[in-house]
């Protein structure tokens, strides 16, 4: 199986705009994305007004289908709100997870 990764970097005009976006996205998208096949979603902050999102899908067609449902319109609306958007995507060449149990952080 070849997993597909879509990474999006957003640069907002302010920290408030970034936090508003994250709040709205988390409440409306999480469950639906997982129902549509999303395997993993990671967000990380690179600055007070910037965030990077990483989405791992089972394949490109699943990622593209979900993008057509919500992503294209969302990205257009964000661009119109002066949000800088950079997208990177492709087939994942390696997907490894550490087998160590991290539930006990004292290990």
Predicted features, each with a name:
Residues 1-51, 58-72, 79-107:
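Short S/T/G/P-rich N-terminal loop/turn motif that feeds into the first structured element of a domain
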């Amino acid at each position: 199986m070849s997993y597909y990764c879509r990474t999006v970097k957003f640069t907002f005009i302010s920290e408030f705009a970034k936090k508003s976006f994250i709040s709205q996205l988390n409440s409306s998208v999480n469950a639906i994305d997982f129902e549509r096949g999303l395997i993993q979603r990671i967000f990380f902050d690179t600055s007070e007004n910037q965030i990077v999102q990483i989405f791992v899908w089972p394949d490109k067609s699943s990622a593209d289908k979900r993008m057509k449902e919500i992503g294209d319109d969302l990205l257009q609306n964000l661009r119109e709100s002066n949000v800088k958007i950079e997208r990177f995507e492709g087939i994942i060449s390696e997907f490894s997870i550490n087998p160590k149990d991290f539930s006990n952080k004292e290990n």
